[in-house]
Design a protein with these regions (language model features):
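Fold-level recognition of mixed alpha/beta catalytic cores in primary-metabolism enzymes, strongest
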Residues: 107, 117-126, 130-228, 368-378
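Acidic-glycine-rich active-site phosphate/pyrophosphate-binding loop
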Residues: 88-102, 170, 174, 191-201, ...
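Active-site metal-coordination/substrate-binding segment of hydrolases
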Residues: 76-141
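Metal-dependent amide/peptide-bond hydrolase catalytic core
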Residues: 3, 14, 178-183, 190, ...
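Hydrophobic/aromatic beta-strand patches that form the interior of the parallel beta-sheet core
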Residues: 75-79, 143, 172-174, 353-357
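N-terminal helical capping/dimerization or prosegment-like subdomains
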Residues: 2-88, 263-267, 281-284, 373-375
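A structural signal for short hydrophobic beta-strand segments in well-ordered beta-sheet cores
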Residues: 54, 67, 100-102, 247-250, ...
Length: 394
């Protein structure tokens, strides 16, 4: 083995050890939404050491970070991530959920996959980029929040607003969500469906079940409404982005069996194609349920608009991500818009291309959430390859 190859191997081992240590450190911050628990403070220290300008700000108890470093003139691209996690009690965990312990080459801990693993991998890739002696062009932003797993009102939405008010326009945004399925890099998100919830209050007239002619049965009306909702057609869908409507509750406050119910509440959630907007969805369903209008009141809740990124003819973030993944894995990823909503929606617009790319999502939010060290190293390699394609002048 030559001296150069030997030195490269030693450097690689050292960086891999740093990567593992970074993830363990992040896991040990008990940053349950919206508490950053010191995780963002630690990131500020790490990024400042790499030469980033860092701005930390709070909004309604949420901590956010905007950090950037400017090279020569070139593309303006961001990494968007979150350090908050869903709750975890010791319960059935193999190890305490905030220890970051390694068992048989696997790192266990809340947030290991969603998404502290992605943050640790991008931090290591960022350090490699900064330390590279190659000429670089562009501006690199880090956009981190402690409010992604909750209502997401005061996290990335506020970061996007602050960027806009400062006249900062991103060419691209890489979101480090765990998008992979069977193998790291097998799936990336080039969009997300929108989401919209609703409550329908159905009002009838109560009475004795033996005299139905004197009543208006709210349950019977509700059954017809549920049937109407379940049969709704969505003509604008395309193959890669399907709209689905799921009834999530039918509730009647009735404690006896001889009383026709006067009220019923129906709840439902729609995950809708990027071909629609929330206002279009509301209009379609209001028209569909118009025949029941004298009996119902609809309250719409928690709208999340969809986004969709297509390949561009000039500079294309999709192409950069696809090439980085192919270079590191030998395969091209599947493009998908499936799954839940993400913070990508806050940064996507007609100019900003948003792509989500990260670890496997098979254990997220579960007891014994984990990531293998091999997967962690692989996603870091993809990230560094991607950053090199974006920033290193060729």
């Amino acid at each position: 083995m030559s001296l150069v190859v030997s030195q490269q191997a030693v450097t690689s081992q050292r960086l891999n050890a740093e990567l593992i240590n970074k993830l363990q450190t992040l896991i040990q911050f008990k940053s349950v939404t919206p508490n950053q628990a010191g995780a963002i403070d630690w990131l500020v220290m790490q990024l400042c050491e790499l030469g980033f300008c860092c701005e930390k700000f709070t909004s309604s108890g949420v901590t956010n970070l905007i950090a950037h470093i400017k090279f020569n003139e070139g593309p303006c691209v961001a990494f968007s991530g979150h350090i908050d996690v869903v709750p975890a009690d010791n319960g059935d965990w193999l190890t305490p959920p905030f220890d970051g312990r390694i068992i048989n080459g696997v790192i266990y801990g809340r947030g290991a996959a969603d998404m502290k693993g992605g943050v640790a991998a991008m931090l290591t890739a960022t350090k490699k980029l900064i330390n590279s002696t190659s000429s670089k062009a562009g501006t690199f932003y880090w956009l981190i929040t402690s409010d992604e797993e909750g209502e997401a009102e005061f996290g990335s939405a506020q970061i996007a607003n602050k960027l806009s008010s400062n006249g900062i326009v991103l060419d691209g945004c890489i979101v480090g969500e765990p998008t992979s399925s069977t193998h790291v890099g097998d799936t990336i998100k080039n969009g997300r469906r929108g989401a919209l919830s609703a409550r329908i209050l159905v009002k009838g007239r109560a009475g004795h079940v033996a005299y139905p002619q004197n009543t208006i049965n709210a349950a019977h009306i509700s059954a017809k409404i549920v049937n109407k909702l379940s049969e709704q057609a969505w003509h604008l869908d395309d193959a890669g982005s399907k709209t689905t409507l799921q009834v999530t509750g039918i509730n009647i406050d009735n404690v006896v069996d001889n009383l026709v119910p006067s009220h019923c509440e129906i709840t439902f959630n729609i995950r809708y194609s990027h071909r629609y907007s929330s206002e279009k969805i509301k209009s379609i369903l209001n028209n569909s349920l118009d025949e029941f209008s004298r009996y119902i009141t609809i309250n719409w809740e928690r709208p999340c608009e969809p986004y969709y990124t297509q390949p561009k003819s000039k500079w294309s973030l999709i192409t950069c991500v696809e090439q980085a993944i192919h270079s590191q894995t030998g395969n091209y990823p599947v493009l998908s818009t499936s799954g839940g909503t993400s913070d990508g929606r806050f940064f996507a617009n007609s100019h900003t291309q948003v792509i989500e790319c990260g670890l496997r999502n098979n254990t997220i939010h579960q007891v014994n959430e984990h990531v293998s060290i091999d997967d962690l190293i692989k996603v870091e390699a993809i990230y560094y390859d991607l950053l090199s394609r974006i920033y290193i002048e060729r």
